[in-house]
Amino acid sequence: MTAQKITQHPTARHPLAGKSMSGAEMIIQVLADEGVDTIFGYSGGAILPTYDAIFRYHAAHDGRQIRLIVPANEQGAGFMAAGYARSSGKVGVFLVTSGPGATNSVTPIRDCMADSIPVVLICGQVPRHAIGTDAFQEAPVFNIMSACAKHVFLVHNPEELEATVRTAFDMARSARPGPVVVDVPKDVQNWTGVFKGEGLLHFRGYEARMQALKAARVPEEKCAAFFDQLGKSERPLIYAGGGVINSDASGELRSFAGTFRIPVVTTLLGIGAMDTTHEMSLHMLGMHGMAYANYAVEDCDFLIAVGSRFDDRVAGKVHEFAPRARFVAHIDIDAAEIGKVKNVTWSFVGDARTGLGDLLAAGRKSFKKDFSQWVAYVQQLKKKHARNYDRESRLIQPQYVIECLNEITRGEAIVTSGVGQHQMWAAQYFDFKHPRTWLTSGSMGTMGFGLPAAIGAQVACPDRLVIDVDGDGSLRMNLGELETVTTYNLPVKVLLLNNLGDGMVRQWQKMYFNNRFSGTDKSLHSKDFVKAAEADGFLFAARLTENEKVQEVLREFVEFKGPAFLEIMIDQDACVYPMVGPGMGYKDMVTGDFIRSRDSETCRPGDEVDMTKVPDLF
């Protein structure tokens, strides 16, 4: 998109309109106007004018401070901004310098794009006259980030700086949320101009599309068509994704499911959209979803997808996904997702909250059908194929740890995770009663996400219990952020489930590569995580190796006033089940030795699979 002009919107005149400011001061003033209360960032030469503007803003505004959280590195800043955005629903902001500062930010930007998280990255750039000369700490941010972000701005014209920053926020949170990058040359930050206090960049056709999406409603005839299909079904199932949470549609989802008595499965990122303790909740579906959730997908005859995209971790073999569904409905804010993977019989492009609300209103007037037989059947699935693990082992089972912790938190904590087995155990065994309480890297699967995301969530929600459930591999990736926790005295609880290796990859090697553990065994690594936590200022830093003390120590850990670190040495051979292998459908789901399967003819751990003959989905 190319900006055509700056659009002024008729509002009350800004009290600072007409005042002379530097470009850096304009950036900070727009952030203040957008309600930003926290910036996560790492300084450097090309962004120094803006950091100086933060200092001067604080000096001039005793009652209106913008908190600055300085991480160990820029990737940490990006994931902190993501954790802030995911837990609060507001736009997260991070501020970095040029060159390596910007390139260190690529992974969190891509992570936010993949999971539809609204963040704004402002990065410094070398002066305009030096761009393209391989100047010190120059990197082609526009070219690099364009493939990863929702939009990237390189500010050539300083007169457009104010409107550009304001537009970045508007874009980040509009329609399908995502990350927006603003690359600001140092001389533009030092430029002096007149602050206008209003205005957005204008893009041909963009405003019209956004207005159409905001105004979109489900027409009466489409409501009738939906309920006609629902009336012809006997086994409807709602498949809810992260879009439900992004659109704040959890209330509508719960009302819809409760009113019409339709069970709900959620994606990894949709967890919390439906209270997992609700009778209509079947929790998570997919590769490591609940067995009963996946069986319900196999058995349903009407699949209602809301804010979800049929990705490979859910749909697997697309033609075998929901094979008995005669009808498939899809509600999504992004028209590109409709029919992209799975053909549908009914669709609505628009906000999930609006779509569900319109259907709910229409259905309450005229639709009546009893799905009690299906609901009873689903409840039996939950009982017969309940989650389970080796409860007799003398080794500490990670599932037991999460179960014990869940008895303490009771679905009320904000839980973040790294990526790997611990991520799946946390998703499976925690209860989540509210949206925005389960924060994890879904599509990108970025190791190192959990700790900085927990920091961002704790900053956004200072009165909430925030727990990072991490693995030894993931925690290593951003271990430096332990110091950030104590520097700002954030009461984040870091729970490390240590199995001395990259457990999820090791599980794949066990199941599909005949126990050839190449590069995943970390038992010879000498990292003492407890000493590292103590060195970074944690007053509660402990290691647990005894099964009998799990409940007692977990309670001490959670109730400690301040940052706390607990390492638990778990069974190295514990695996995540269920598991739908690569290139397989739900009928091939492996449930392990402790979860009851309704088909014992599936492949078992130890059966080597020729990985050259199945799609590479790892």
Where are these regions (language model features)?
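Glycine-rich, acidic loop regions that bind phosphate or pyrophosphate groups
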Residues: Q4-I6, C123-V165, K186, G270-Y377, ...
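Conformationally flexible catalytic loops at phosphate/diphosphate-handling active centers
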Residues: M171-K232, A386-R387, M589-T591
